[in-house]
Regions:
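Glycine- (often His-adjacent) and acidic-residue-rich active-site loop
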Residues: 3, 59-97, 110, 138-141, ...
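Conserved CoA-thioester-binding segment of acyl-CoA-metabolizing enzymes
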Residues: 1-62, 76
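Crotonase-fold acyl-CoA enzyme core
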Residues: 96-209, 232, 240-241, 245-249, ...
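Acidic-histidine catalytic/liganding microenvironments
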Residues: 6, 25, 49, 68, ...
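A short, glycine- and basic residue-enriched loop/turn
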Residues: 25-28, 62-63, 68, 129-131, ...
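Terminal peptide-recognition signature
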Residues: 20, 24, 39, 57, ...
């Protein structure tokens, strides 16, 4: 296991899995500009590292995944200090070309930018006490880091508008019922469950996973007949890979495949 310590986050590589933990519990894991830029650097490394195939994002403690933008910092330093990298809030919300899968392990409040980071992930596992929401209008802001765009793509528009226009929170159970969250578990089982999902993904060919994610994301919003005809770079990379030979061979030989991501 490789562990890299940052001031506002921790970054661990456990075999093929990277675990990113926001580490500002004294501020409910809310992010200020230095934390945003640290997370940008971490996700840049995650994308570049060929040895890492799945990411997990969580927060320190049992109270908050992330409470979003650090409003106290903003109040002290002014709104012009709301800065982040081009990759968006937490280095993630604008990172639309990352084809490696990322799992959000929501360990408490995921509000504002915190919820937007979770929505930018591919799978969300929530602790049973978690609450999620986009309360930005209640403090004179809007969910501009993707929340107003992603939530209506996940749940029906009218229901999404109800949350966006009121700033209401949804419980983990409500989020699961609406299809925002994949699974709800007790807090003590959260990371074990997230790691279990990651291991299940790792049982699949990594290039197949990336090709599938790219096709899903680039096909969203397209008419079906258009989406079916789109060409995808990750699919072409998959077709030319050793793994497309290894998969059928392992099946025929009744053994587990040895994926190489090449």
């Amino acid at each position: 296991m490789t562990r890299m310590a940052y001031e506002y986050a921790t970054y661990e590589k456990k075999g093929r899995i990277a675990v990113v933990t926001v580490n500002r519990p004294e501020r409910m894991n809310a992010l200020h500009p230095p934390a945003n830029f640290e997370l940008d650097a971490i996700w840049n490394d995650f994308e570049r590292d060929a040895a890492v195939w799945v990411g997990i994002l969580t927060g320190t403690g049992d109270k908050a995944f992330s409470a979003g933008n650090d409003l106290r910092f903003t109040a002290e330093h002014g709104r012009d200090m709301i800065r982040m990298a081009d990759s968006g809030f937490g280095g993630l919300t604008n990172r639309t070309q990352c084809w490696k899968p990322i799992i959000a392990a929501v360990n408490g409040y995921a509000l504002g930018g915190g919820f937007e980071m979770a929505l930018a992930c591919d799978i969300i596992i929530a602790a049973d006490h978690a609450r999620l929401g986009l309360p930005e209008p209640r403090v004179g802001l809007m969910a501009g880091a993707g929340g107003v765009h992603r939530l209506p793509r996940v749940i029906p528009q009218k229901i999404a508008m109800g949350y966006i226009l009121t700033g209401r929170h949804m419980t983990a159970q409500e989020a699961h019922r609406l299809g925002v969250v994949n699974e709800v578990v007790p807090l003590a089982q959260l990371m074990t469950t997230a790691l279990g999902w990651a291991e299940e993904i790792l049982a699949c060919a990594p290039l197949s996973i990336r090709a599938s994610k790219q096709a899903v994301m680039m096909g969203l919003g397209q008419p079906l007949d258009v989406a079916l005809k789109l060409g995808f770079t990750e699919a072409e990379r998959m077709r030319r890979s050793e793994d497309t030979v290894e998969g059928p061979r392992a099946f025929a030989e009744k053994r587990k495949p040895n994926w190489k991501a090449r």
